[in-house]
Amino acid sequence: DFNSLVKSKHYKWDSEDKCWYRNLTEQTGTYSDRAAEIGHELLRNGFCICIHDPDITEKAINGDYKKEISKWVKWNEKTQSLALYWLVKDESYDASRKIVGNRYNFDTQCVDIHISHYRAVNNFAKKYNFQFSEAAIVAIEQYKEEKRNMRKVKVKDV
């Protein structure tokens, strides 16, 4: 039914405004792609739709939109760690719990991993098709720069 379909695409009902909505972020993709996606799914399931933008309408009809990326490596500023995020958990969750230093964050419902383990996170991300957020990329580059600039010393015996 209609409600199940829009809920499966992560839309929520606003009882005050009497409409379905979805907050969009860097991770969800563009408005036009998400509008085309929900339009396409509604059409495929026999619902009539009305989209006022002709380009988005064509994308909805043809299914020609960028698929939503549902697995992300984000940067958690509060914990200063890389955060593995799933829109829907899958087999990669168990694998993430094997990365050294992982910790489940109950507040964010993500798996946090200290940035010093960025190589393991990168390997994991490649294997399980996770995308890095811009903030995570910046944090990793900053960490690598700090490591390069660390002064190595040899302590004399006294």
Predicted feature locations:
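Accessory DNA-engaging acidic/polar modules
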Residues: 1-158
